[in-house]
Amino acid sequence: MRNALIVGINNYPGHELNCCVNDANEVARLLEYNKDESRNFSIIKLLDEQATYDNILDKLTKVFNDDSDVSLFYFSGHGYDDKNDGKICTIDYKSQHYGIPFRTILEHIRESKCKNKIIILDCCHAGKLGNFSMIGDATILECGTTILTACNTCESAIETNGHGLFTKLLIDALEGGASDIFGRITPGSIYSYIDSSLGSFDQRPLFKSHVQSFVTLRVANEKMSFVEMRTLMKLFSNEKATFQLNPSYEPTNYPGSKEIGKEDLKKPYFQENNGKIFGLLQKATSNGLVRPSNEKHMFYAAMNSDTCELTAIGKHYWWLAKNKII
C-alpha cells in the first residue's frame, strides 16, 4: 500500500496565500497515478477549511499508523518559527498555537511502522524540520525516513506564476524531469532536480534521508525499456569495448535512396537486421548512453565504418546489466 496526505491552505484569515491549493491539487494528481495511468498512491486531500489542527493530525495518524510500503505527507501553506521549534500553520491557527509543531510530525514518523516515510514541506522555515539540534534527540531521523523542504531554517518560501517556486519544480520533477532511463522518480532524484534548477541567490531546499535505498515515488515515461537496455548491453563485451559499424547499418544507404545521392552510397548496403541494431544504438545515443568513437554523428560512424562506445553513464548501466540488477 502507498498512502499520501496532501494539504494545501490559501485562505488563512488575514494572511492569505495564492498558490497552495493549486500546488496541493497538482501534487495529488501526479502522485495518484503513474504516467501510464496505473494506480500509485491512495490520496487523502485537505484543502483550506478542511485543514484544521485536529483534522490534519487525525489524517496524519491514519496515513502513517500502519505498515504501508510508502506513507507521504505533503504540506503547502504558512510556516512559523517560534525559536525552539517550527510549525506548519493550520487554517484555525491562533496566537496561543500557530499550528502543528515539527516535533509532533516527527514523533508520528518515529512511531510509524511504515517502511518508507516521506515528508515534503513547502512553507517558510521548513528547514527547521531537519534541524534536530533544535527539536531534540527524541526525534532523531528514523530508518526509512526522508525529509524534503522548500527552504532552509531561516528562509522564506516563494510563490511565483501560480505555484510555489519549490512545488513548481517538484511538479516538473514528478512529470518526468527527475526520472531515470526507466522513468523511475525517487526522492533523491527530485532533490537533485530541484537543487540544480535554483540559482545561488534563490531559496535553497533541504534534503535529509536515512534510508538503505530510495523508493520510487512515481513512474513517468521510460526512455528505454529494460529489454532494450539488456539487449543494448549485450552488444558490448565489456564496459570499454567498442561496437563496429559499417554502411549496412544506415537505413538510408540503399540504391534508389532519396536521402543519399548515388555517388555517396557505400557497400555493403543497408541490411534490415543491422538497421534494428542501429536504431537501438541511436536511441541509446539520444539518451546519453552511447556515442560515436571518432565521428560527430552516428550516421557518419556507420558510413565511414567507424565504431561506437559506451559513455560514462552507459558503462554504469552495463555494470548493472552484467550483475543482473536490471
Model-derived segments and spans:
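Short glycine-rich His-centered loop
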Residues: 1-15
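Active-site-proximal C-terminal subdomain of hydrolase catalytic domains
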Residues: 8-9, 31, 118-208
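A short, glycine/acidic-enriched catalytic loop
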Residues: 16-22, 48, 55, 78-112
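Glycine- and acidic-residue-enriched helix-capping/strand-helix junction motifs
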Residues: 12-26, 160
